[in-house]
Amino acid sequence: MYKRQVYVPPPGAAAAIWEAVEADLDLVICITEGIPVRDMLEVRNKMLQKEAKGGKKTLLLGPNCPGLITPDEIKIGIMPGHIHRKGRIGVVSRSGTLTYEAVGQLSSIGLGQSTAVGIGGDPINGLKHIDIMKMFNEDPETDAVIMIGEIGGPDEVEAARWCKTNMKKPVVAVSYTHLTLPTNREV
């Protein structure tokens, strides 16, 4: 698998992502936060057009993500490796901080992780909760999954609906939406 990490300031990050897509890399992980939405829309549209024309599909994790880690095997991104322990629980979250908290709590009680994935919190991103849940569902190294949601969109709901009818493994879904939602706002 050919992969690239993108640690480029926001004005040039979309171009760096597209460069990796044009090179037919399998996976691009973009840590950069605050890439202009218009730039990311353009990259996403070009990625979809390339795939529609039969071009190779490149998976994009992020932007604004901490990356991913499979303990004792691979770490791509900025996740603190010392809190992770090898195990059989998958973790997926849009929030880096909440990912670290969940992983730290799991590790402290002796439950390790198969893989932890931070998908990123920017408005236009690549892989969604549902994509990672499908991967965990097929992963023989994962026995259960923690899915952590935030305020911001329908992705967590879509993943939860998919899990309800398709997931073969136990899922703990945590959403901080209503705990942090201003009282005068609806989602």
Residue ranges and their predicted role:
Residues 1-5, 177-183:
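Conserved small/polar residues in nucleotide/adenosyl-binding loops
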Residues 5-14, 32-36, 149-153:
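N-terminal glycine-rich "phosphate-gripper" loop used for MgATP/nucleotide binding
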Residues 12-30:
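Rossmann-fold NAD(P) dinucleotide-binding segment
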Residues 17-21, 103, 133, 160:
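Generic hydrophobic/aromatic pocket-lining and core-packing "Φ" positions
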Residues 30, 59-64, 68-70, 93, ...:
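General beta-strand structural signal in soluble alpha/beta enzymes
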Residues 34-56:
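Rossmann-fold NAD(P)-binding glycine/threonine-rich loop
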Residues 44, 48, 59-89:
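Glycine-rich anion-binding loops of enzyme active sites
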Residues 87-134:
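Short glycine-cluster motifs
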